[in-house]
Regions:
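Low-complexity, intrinsically disordered/propeptide-like segments
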Residues: 8, 125-128, 175
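Generic N-terminal initiation segments characterized by hydrophobic and/or small/turn-forming residues
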Residues: 67, 93, 119-122, 132, ...
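Amphipathic alpha-helical coiled-coil segments with heptad-repeat character
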Residues: 31, 60, 71, 82, ...
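ASCE P-loop NTPase motor core, strongest for the SF2 helicase catalytic module
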Residues: 1, 39, 46, 157-183
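Amphipathic heptad-repeat alpha-helical coiled-coil/stalk segments that mediate oligomerization
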Residues: 103-151
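Inter-lobe coupling linker of SF2 helicases/translocases
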Residues: 1-122
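Short, functional N-terminal and low-complexity linear motifs
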Residues: 1-6, 50-55, 137-140, 155-163
Length: 183
């Protein structure tokens, strides 16, 4: 988008972006973490796609977005993925406690509305929104967007039942253990 902007003279307004890939070797521990997080993302992406195809596109898109951001953080640094996994685990544990409390105390009608109520709080984000952040974005806009990104990344899940949520939390615990070894 911004690459297409021209000056009044018809010249590109911004210089051409050039990205270079730098090859480097992963240690065995880094490779294990990369493979495990990639498998987690791949599996959950499949579940997100099923959710979208079943008619809940917003939820499916949010889960897909959250997982894509996690995968990018994996490429960023071991510390970045560790912190992201820890935050995600904490938020999903909070959600599990809340769902368990509702299941124990709510009427049947309230129990049916539980999932919709949690998902309704998440803003809709896409990877295009994430990629479109540029240098012209103000610090305030960037902070607001990053806050929304963290909110979705930490909370969006394909789990649809309490046992599925427990299983995802257990996977995150395993990933965190491996990430600590890499750190």
């Amino acid at each position: 988008v911004k690459e297409d902007l021209l000056t009044f003279e018809g010249k590109p307004l911004f210089p051409e972006r050039r990205a270079y890939t730098v090859a480097y070797e992963l240690s065995p521990a880094e490779r294990e973490l990369y493979d495990l997080v990639t498998e987690y993302v791949r599996t959950e992406m499949g579940r997100a796609e099923c959710i979208s195809q079943a008619g809940d596109r917003k939820r499916g898109n949010n889960v897909g977005f959250a997982l894509t951001v996690l995968q990018r953080r994996l490429a960023s640094s071991p510390e970045a993925i560790l912190r992201s996994l820890e935050r995600r685990q904490r938020r999903l544990e909070d959600r599990l406690r809340e769902l368990t409390r509702i299941q124990e105390t709510a009427s049947p009608a309230e129990k049916e509305q539980t999932d919709a109520r949690f998902d309704a709080k998440l803003p809709s984000l896409s990877i295009h929104d994430y990629e479109d952040m540029d240098l012209e974005t103000t610090d305030s806009e960037r902070l607001q967007f990053e806050t929304q990104v963290e909110y979705v990344v930490d909370r969006a899940t394909a789990a649809q039942t309490i046992p599925e949520l427990r299983a995802e939390i257990a996977i995150l615990e395993d990933l965190i253990r491996v990430a600590y070894k890499v750190r």
